[in-house]
Design a protein with these regions (language model features):
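Function-dense linear segments that define catalytic or interfacial modules
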Residues: 14-136, 148-153
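Aromatic-lined, polymer-binding surfaces characteristic
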Residues: 139-146
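Acidic, glycine-enriched catalytic cores built around paired aspartates
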Residues: 198-203
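Conserved, charged catalytic cores of large soluble enzymes
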Residues: 1-42, 111, 115, 146-194
Length: 204
């Protein structure tokens, strides 16, 4: 089967069903934080829905802690000083809970262990989670997404293809990203940077 024909079949099926999910790994690796590139890490796959593109290798199984905000109520929470901060802190707390239940963090000590050292401190009943726990420990990957975009547009009588919809999209996601990065900076000062992100000022 010629590659062009296969590609056309994939695109046609995607247009009809929404699947299969298609991921450009070269683009994912271009967007990987420089700190992780410097460690020789690489994205080789995504999860099924393709919203998680994290490095995996013989020592790591990708772990990402996800939540979402409801954009339908954006006007109600956009001016809150704490809303996004609280979401980021909650996600970091969930990761910390996973790490602490998987690893003897007191015995492990300093917060920058190699895999060979780390695996010796994984709790006996969590040995099957060693690579996942190490990934969580090193990267502290979180994702704060959004739902309710169309609901916001409907509630405010905004046409989906209008410039107003495009403007809202940019405004909402810029707000979320700006507040999320600021929250991660604050957490890095309070709790320390993720080992993979040393020097970035980021916790997640």
């Amino acid at each position: 089967l010629p590659a062009r024909d296969l590609w056309l079949q994939l695109i046609h099926t995607r247009a009809e069903t929404g699947e299969p999910y298609i991921v450009n790994l070269d683009r994912c690796n271009e967007a990987l934080p420089q700190e992780q590139k410097d460690l020789g890490l690489e994205v080789t796959q995504s999860n099924l829905c393709s919203e998680i593109t994290l490095p995996t290798d013989s020592e790591r199984t990708a772990v990402c802690c996800l939540s979402s905000v409801n954009l339908e109520y954006f006007d109600e929470w956009k001016n809150s000083e704490q809303f996004i901060d609280d979401m980021i802190t909650m996600l970091d707390n969930v990761l910390e809970n996973f790490i602490e239940h998987s690893v003897d963090t007191k015995g492990l000590g300093r917060y920058n262990a190699t895999y060979d050292r780390f695996k010796n401190y994984v709790k006996k009943d969590h040995k099957g989670f060693t690579k996942a726990a190490y990934s969580a420990y090193r990267e502290r990957a979180i994702g704060l997404g959004a739902m309710g975009f169309c609901s916001y547009l409907q509630r405010n009588a905004i046409n989906f293809e209008s410039m107003y919809a495009t403007s809202f999209n940019h405004r909402a996601f810029s707000h979320i990203k700006e507040r999320a990065v600021a929250a991660s900076n604050s957490l890095a000062e309070e709790r320390g940077e993720a080992p993979d992100m040393a020097g970035s000022g980021l916790r997640n």
